[in-house]
A protein has these predicted regions:
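N-terminal prepro-regions of secreted/extracellular proteins
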Residues: 1-53
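Post-signal peptide N-terminal regions of Sec-secreted extracellular proteins
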Residues: 30-133
């Protein structure tokens, strides 16, 4: 009888622990889509320059916000996109070209710190759409 009670106690503890882990995992997974919706919900319209280099904004730069962790672009046409950063030390540093299909959100840059100055370039030509940063 002692062994049977002890076994039930251990099984109950395991079940409670597993249930707690499941609840915590579900809560974390549910938070991720909310963050993405919040980020993309603040998207702005963009229109690149009409001549090469095809970029947005047409001059200067924009600054990342705490709304998004990444720089997200939804071009009307499919295009190779890259993000160019302007560090406070001067100069410009651009990441590699990334293909983003027309009409869908794609990542132009990931894990970008808040307050980072940047602009976006399009390789194939004039582009317009939405950007969230």
């Amino acid at each position: 009888m002692f062994n049977h009670s002890r076994t039930l106690g251990v099984l109950a503890a395991v079940a409670l622990t597993a249930g707690g882990l499941t609840a915590a995992t579900t809560a974390t997974a549910a938070a991720a889509p909310t963050a993405v919706q919040s980020c993309l919900g603040g998207a702005k319209s963009f229109s690149s320059t009409y001549t090469a280099p095809y970029r947005w904004p047409g001059s200067g730069s924009v600054t990342t916000t705490s709304t998004c962790n990444d720089i997200n672009v939804k071009p009307y046409y499919g295009d190779n996109v890259r993000t160019c950063f302007l560090p406070s030390s001067g100069g410009t540093s651009c990441n590699a070209w990334r293909w983003i299909s027309g009409g869908v959100w794609g990542l132009a840059a990931t894990d970008v710190k808040d307050g980072t100055k940047f602009y976006v370039e399009f390789q194939l030509g004039y582009e317009y759409g939405s950007v969230a940063y």
